[in-house]
């Protein structure tokens, strides 16, 4: 079979929109499609070229690498169809901040994101319309646009939209709706951030493409961070939390500028 004749579907995340659940509990259970897991993403192009399945599903969640990765896959397989999931901006940025916090970043939320656009996370990182423009730039096919909230509210409707779009099948009895990774509490994250601000000023580097360095230089810190957060579970809340991890009023005011961006997503979501 020619590569141009193969049906290819590319789930691009975003990160913190239920991607891990899909990658662990749903995509491997789909029938009539070859799923290339996130752990094999780095060689997915070679896998597709060297095998002869009728259709393929690739999955990997992106944020700042979004355009680079979309361009890379579409350059090899222009027929690729995109699956993208968005989440309401306030919930999404909060979840992103917590993810970075548990990985050793000890800055405040205001330094992570602020209205002056001087934080680590910038306005261009927040605009979903920019990501939709990137998809339209490289793909001629209509993407499947989903909302993370629907996965929570009506999971089987959400999952069926993916199976229908990809021409695959699944059995409800095969799908576990259990959360794959539970979230850490505010108390645990604040305690870890205090620890890192004293003992680990710079977060450990993540070696995605080098397993040896990953296990030698990153994994020990990862294990220690988890131990610290586990320890925090047994400490009094009043001892740790002096102020909220994220100020809700500040968050609400900061996110108002993205109301129209979210309305655009609601108007095009499937």
Q: For each of these PLM feature ranges, what is it?
A:
Residues 2-270:
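Anion-recognition interface
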């Amino acid at each position: 079979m020619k590569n141009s004749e193969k049906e290819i579907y590319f789930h691009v995340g975003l990160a913190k929109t239920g991607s891990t659940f899909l990658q662990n509990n749903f995509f491997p259970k789909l029938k009539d499609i070859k799923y290339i897991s996130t752990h094999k993403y780095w060689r997915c192009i070679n896998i597709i070229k060297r095998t002869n399945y009728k259709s393929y599903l690739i999955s990997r969640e992106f944020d700042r690498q979004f355009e680079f990765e979309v361009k890379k896959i579409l350059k090899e397989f222009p027929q690729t169809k995109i699956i993208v999931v968005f989440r309401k901006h306030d919930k999404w940025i909060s979840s992103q901040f917590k993810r970075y916090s548990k990985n050793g970043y000890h800055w405040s939320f205001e330094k992570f994101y602020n209205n002056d656009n001087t934080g680590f996370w910038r306005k261009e990182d927040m605009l979903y319309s920019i990501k939709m423009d990137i998809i339209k730039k490289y793909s001629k096919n209509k993407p499947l646009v989903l909302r993370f909230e629907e996965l929570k509210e009506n999971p089987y409707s959400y999952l069926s939209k993916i199976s229908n779009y990809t021409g695959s099948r699944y059995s409800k009895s095969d799908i576990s709706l259990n959360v794959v990774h539970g979230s850490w509490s505010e108390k645990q994250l604040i305690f870890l951030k205090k620890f890192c601000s004293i003992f680990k000023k710079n977060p450990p580097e993540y070696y995605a493409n080098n397993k040896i360095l990953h296990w030698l230089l990153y994994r020990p810190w990862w294990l220690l961070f988890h131990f610290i957060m586990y320890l925090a579970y047994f400490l009094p809340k009043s001892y740790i939390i002096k102020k909220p991890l994220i100020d809700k009023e500040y968050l609400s005011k900061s996110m108002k500028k993205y109301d129209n961006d979210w309305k655009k997503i609601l108007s095009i979501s499937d």
